[in-house]
C-alpha cells in the first residue's frame, strides 16, 4: 500500500516511493515558478538528501557558502531542537553551484524582508523561517509539498520521498554506495544496501551486461 502524505516522520524503508524521471521533471518545472523560499526548501531537500528535520534544524551559520556545504549537526521537530540520534547523522553535505546561487539569492531576500520589519538577519537565525519569523513547521513543509505534487500531477509520494529520490538517482548514476551512505548519514553501509537493494539489483544486472560487452570488444 502507498504511504499517505502527513506531517509525521516516515521510516526509511523500501516502501518509501521515489520520483520517476518524468515525475521529477514535472515537479522541478512547477518548482521553478514558485517563490524563492519554496524553491530553496525543496531543492535543498532534493539535492542534499537531508531529512526534513535536519533542514528545519539548519541555521545560517551551518551553511558554508565558500566551501559549499551544509554542516548538519541538529534536527528539529515542531516542539524543539535536538541533537541527531547517531554520530553519523552529524556530517557535512556538499552542494552544487546552482543551489549555491539560489541560497545566496534567498539570503539577500531574507535580509531585505527582515530589514523592512526592523530586524537584522543573524547567522544564528534558522535557515527557513515562517512568515511570522518562527521556525517553519513539519506540517507547513508537508502542506507546501502536497500543493507542488498536485500541480505536478504526482501522487502517493511523501516529503521523505525527496531523500529517497536523491539516493536512488545517485546510485543509478553510478555513485559509490559508501559515499551515498555517508551523505545520507546512515549509521552503517548495510542500512543503505538494505534500503536501496532493488536499485542495486538493477545496477548488478547492468554490470553483468557491461562485462559481457567488454569481453566481446577484446
Report each predicted region and the residues it spans.
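Basic, Lys/Arg- and aromatic-enriched nucleic-acid-binding interface segment
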Residues: 1-58, 66, 90, 98, ...
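DNA/chromatin major-groove-contacting recognition/catalytic segments
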Residues: 4, 26-30, 81-84, 198-218
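Conserved tyrosine-mediated DNA breakage-rejoining catalytic core shared by Y-recombinases
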Residues: 7, 48, 57-112
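Catalytic-site neighborhood detector that most strongly recognizes the C-terminal catalytic loop/helix
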Residues: 18, 76, 184-210
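C-terminal catalytic core of tyrosine-transesterase DNA break-rejoin enzymes
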Residues: 43, 47-54, 139-140, 144-152, ...
Amino acid at each position: 500500500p502507498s504511504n499517505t502524505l502527513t506531517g509525521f516522520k516516515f521510516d526509511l524503508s523500501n516502501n518509501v516511493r521515489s520520483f520517476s524521471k518524468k515525475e521529477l521533471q514535472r515537479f522541478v518545472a512547477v518548482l521553478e515558478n514558485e517563490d524563492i523560499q519554496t524553491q530553496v526548501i525543496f531543492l535543498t531537500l532534493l539535492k542534499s538528501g537531508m531529512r526534513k528535520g535536519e533542514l528545519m534544524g539548519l541555521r545560517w551559520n551551518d551553511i558554508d557558502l565558500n566551501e559549499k556545504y551544509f554542516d548538519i549537526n541538529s534536527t528539529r521537530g515542531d516542539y524543539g531542537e535536538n541533537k541527531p540520534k547517531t554520530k553519523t547523522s552529524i556530517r557535512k553535505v556538499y552542494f552544487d553551484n546552482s543551489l549555491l546561487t539560489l541560497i545566496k539569492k534567498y539570503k539577500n531576500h531574507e535580509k531585505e524582508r527582515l530589514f523592512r520589519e526592523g530586524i537584522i538577519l543573524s547567522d544564528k537565525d534558522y535557515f527557513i523561517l515562517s512568515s511570522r519569523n518562527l521556525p517553519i513547521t513539519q506540517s507547513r513543509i508537508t502542506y507546501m509539498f502536497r500543493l507542488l505534487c498536485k500541480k505536478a500531477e504526482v501522487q502517493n509520494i511523501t516529503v521523505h520521498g525527496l531523500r529517497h529520490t536523491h539516493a536512488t538517482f545517485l546510485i543509478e548514476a553510478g555513485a559509490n554506495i559508501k559515499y551515498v551512505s555517508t551523505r545520507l548519514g546512515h549509521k552503517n553501509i548495510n542500512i543503505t544496501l538494505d534500503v536501496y537493494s532493488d536499485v542495486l539489483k538493477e545496477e548488478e544486472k547492468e554490470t553483468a551486461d557491461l562485462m559481457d560487452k567488454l569481453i566481446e570488444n577484446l
